[in-house]
Amino acid sequence: ILDKYTTKKILVMEYIDGIPITNIEHLKKHNLNLKVLSENGVRIFLKQVFQDNFFHADMHPGNIFASKESPEKPFYYAVDYAICGSLTESNQILLAQMISCLLERDFFSLAQLFIFADWVKEDTKTEELESVLRANCESLLDKPLSQILFGELLLNLFDGMKQFDLYLDNDLVLLVKTLIHIEGMGRQIYPDLDFWSVAQPF
């Protein structure tokens, strides 16, 4: 925002000369490294979540642009920060444990985790929840890790929990929605995006 020119009636912001992130034709025309671009998108968001603990929660394609500068090391412009999120420390830990349980196929511990977190109704039986989570997610985990769609896995996971009165904090809902957007955009830019390899350091 350019304060010098902004008044009560007029909001003046700098002009961003970027390429809409899903305009693949223009990204290629400017010789942007699409693999690096897609991987950096995942890194940027995960850094916001796990290191900065303040994330842009409205990262749909209309709010994300790619810079035309340094095509081999492309970077992003993100606009419209009207919706942002921040996780409590306990939810950060729970999220990391949830992903770990999924990758290890430890559905019993995953069920215990959800009950402990009060994400399901209090009379939920661990064995019943474990069975549903396994039925919804195990087949997706049979693929090589690089081919597992994180967004699809999360949707199946939470779909199975609906019958147990799934409840998530607003910031967790924002996080899940944004993660799905990020992975989807990343794979649209570079279909062979390996979300898990990029996410591993976090």
Predicted features by range, described:
Residues I1-F202:
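Conserved catalytic cores of large enzyme domains
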